[in-house]
Structure formats: C-alpha cells, structure tokens
C-alpha cells in the first residue's frame, strides 16, 4: 500500500467518523440550533467523501445546494420559529421510548441485512467526459417536475416560518404596549 493510498484511507476514515458523530449529534442534542449546525457539518463531510470518490461536481453541488441553501433555510426557520416550551412528560413515555427503540433497531437490522446480501461491483467505469452536461440535462428534462416541487416546497416553508414569526411578534408588541400604559388586558375579561 502506497503512501497516497494510506492518506486517502485515513481521510476517508476521518470523514466517516465525522459524519457518524455529527449525525448522532443532530439526533441526540436537545438544542435544535446546535443540531442544525451539526447537520451542516455532516453535509460537508459527505461532500468530502464525494471528493475522495473523484466526483468533484457532486461534491460542489452538495456544498452549494445542501449546505449553502437548504441548511441555511433550516437554520433561519429554527431561529424564526424557535419556541421554548416546557414539555410535560407523559405517563407512557417509557412505552414510547421502547417502541421507537424497537423500530430503529428493526430498521438497523433490515438495512444491515440488505447491505451484506447485496452483490457489490468492485470497479465502476466512470466517464468524466460530459458528465456535468449529462447531469444538467437529466435534471432539467427527466427530473424537472421533482426539481420544481422541491424548490416550491422550500419556498413555502420559508414563507410559512416568516409568517408564524411575524404573527407572534405582533401579539407580543400589543401585550407590551398594554402593560406599558398600565391598561387592563382586554383578553383577560
């Protein structure tokens, strides 16, 4: 094994560890803002894996589209709609945790069996000539409708988050004006 192969294997191992730790942080951290930042880190690690697989265009698209656009929209939505609520633990919380653990473990076993039962191809012939134009043609011809649906869905999500945040701000401003003037609150009659 040459030195460059060792460096490539070490880089792949570090990116895989970063992806797994970041994904666990996204799921397990109680602060949703930190989860959003870790999601960006996971997406950057995945782009690094694409770079190691000699798919530079996919890596650049991963960073531009997912990290640069979608993760920023998610973080804006989190910051605009971040409500601090006290969650009351329910009586059947233990049953919910057990059921969700069972479902996650079942999916893990199912995916593990699928991975080990799949016949993987050792080498894949990748044609780099005109690959970017082929991807662009597929996106804007065969996959135009899903592409537009996703863009409209992201736009509606962002507009909805702004609308919800502004609606809450208006009610808070109205309540603060009433308390400033020492007037009785009309909602408490």
Swiss-Prot record:
GO terms for molecular function: NADH dehydrogenase (ubiquinone) activity; quinone binding. It comes from the Eukaryota. PANTHER family: NADH-UBIQUINONE OXIDOREDUCTASE CHAIN 6. It holds the Pfam family Oxidored_q3. InterPro entries: NADH_UbQ/plastoQ_OxRdtase_su6, Nuo/plastoQ_OxRdtase_6_NuoJ. It is an enzyme of class 7 (translocase). It is found in: Plastid, Chloroplast thylakoid membrane. This is NAD(P)H-quinone oxidoreductase subunit 6, chloroplastic. Its EC number is 7.1.1.-. The chain crosses the membrane at residues 10-30, 32-52, 61-81, 98-118, 144-164. Keywords: Chloroplast, Membrane, NAD, NADP, Plastid, Plastoquinone, Quinone, Thylakoid, Translocase, Transmembrane, Transmembrane helix, Transport. The gene is ndhG. NDH shuttles electrons from NAD(P)H:plastoquinone, via FMN and iron-sulfur (Fe-S) centers, to quinones in the photosynthetic chain and possibly in a chloroplast respiratory chain. The immediate electron acceptor for the enzyme in this species is believed to be plastoquinone. Couples the redox reaction to proton translocation, and thus conserves the redox energy in a proton gradient. It comes from Mesostigma viride (Green alga). Belongs to the complex I subunit 6 family. It catalyses: a plastoquinone + NADH + (n+1) H(+)(in) = a plastoquinol + NAD(+) + n H(+)(out); a plastoquinone + NADPH + (n+1) H(+)(in) = a plastoquinol + NADP(+) + n H(+)(out).
